[in-house]
């Protein structure tokens, strides 16, 4: 191993898909990789803060495995405000169960997380104060979670500027950076398919309206039958509010992440494009994707870090 060298790990955002970082970290642990510093953005800040404050990966996975659809209610408190549809108090209560009132100084592994000052449009790297407050700032997706006021700044999700916090981890004077950044190749295929299917449904509707008279009952019934079949077939695969939100966040992540992935000495990219933004109930599967991505890079990791 790189004796005396400081290894840092950067964990990207990604909402539920960011749970894949747990699988990545498990593989790195089993390989004997010892991180001296961790930086997180959004979901990466949750996982990073938990690990650095002493919560084990096994404990995290156990909690994720216990989630069901009701778990979403534990994080959702609708807010009738102009700043976000979710107030964030329930999220804060859940974070406090794990982080209590621990501060950055209590961390066993050096930690920082990234947020954005929505007023000045500046990146803010948080390194002091209560972990819970810093994480709450880093996960505050604009328009979704209400922003948090911290040290005179109005803070939102760090993924707007630095979705993979390699610059933040580099500032902690690390010698080697491992980045874990989610990717969405399957997502692109899925939404291209949905777009084609929805466009075809529109064409069928238009054709039926303009070209088939009501008097031509056989053709009309055939067209309606085909149309209904396509609707049933795609009943669970429609372009919904969630799919639009998923795709929007993916676009932001893709466009912004490229400049930060280049700073990583090793880049691990869990393929989680077929999972949704809120797929907390599929956490075990998402974690497994992280394991698979890290194992695929095991040879490169061993070579670069001179592991046996």
Regions found by a protein language model. Give the residues of each.
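Patatin-like phospholipase
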Residues: 1-41, 49-308
């Amino acid at each position: 191993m790189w004796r005396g060298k400081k290894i840092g790990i950067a964990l990207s955002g990604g909402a539920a898909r960011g749970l894949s970082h747990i699988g990545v970290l498990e593989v790195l642990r089993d390989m004997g990789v010892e991180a001296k510093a961790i930086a997180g953005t959004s979901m990466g800040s949750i996982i990073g803060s938990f690990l650095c404050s002493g919560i084990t990966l096994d404990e995290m996975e156990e909690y994720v495995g216990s989630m069901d659809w009701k778990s979403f209610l534990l994080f959702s408190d609708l807010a009738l405000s102009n700043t976000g549809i979710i107030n964030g108090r329930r999220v804060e209560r859940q974070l406090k169960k794990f982080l209590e009132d621990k501060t950055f100084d209590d961390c066993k592994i050096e930690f920082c997380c990234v947020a954005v000052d929505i007023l000045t449009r500046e990146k803010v790297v948080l390194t002091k104060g209560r972990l819970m407050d810093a994480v709450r700032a880093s996960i505050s997706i604009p328009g979704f979670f209400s922003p948090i006021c911290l040290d005179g700044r109005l803070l939102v999700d760090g993924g707007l500027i630095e979705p993979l916090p390699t610059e933040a981890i580099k500032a902690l004077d690390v010698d080697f950076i491992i980045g874990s950044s989610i990717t969405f190749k399957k997502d692109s295929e899925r939404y291209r398919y949905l777009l084609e299917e929805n466009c075809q449904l529109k064409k069928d509707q238009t054709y039926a309206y303009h070209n088939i008279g009501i008097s031509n009952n056989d053709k009309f019934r055939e067209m309606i039958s085909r149309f209904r079949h396509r609707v049933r077939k795609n009943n669970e695969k429609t372009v919904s509010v969630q799919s639009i939100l998923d795709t929007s966040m993916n676009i932001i992540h893709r466009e912004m992440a490229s400049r930060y992935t280049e700073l990583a000495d090793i880049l691990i990219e869990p393929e989680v494009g077929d999972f949704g933004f809120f797929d907390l109930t599929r956490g075990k599967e998402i974690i497994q994707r992280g394991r698979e991505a890290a194992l695929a890079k095991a040879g490169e990791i061993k070579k670069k870090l001179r592991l046996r």
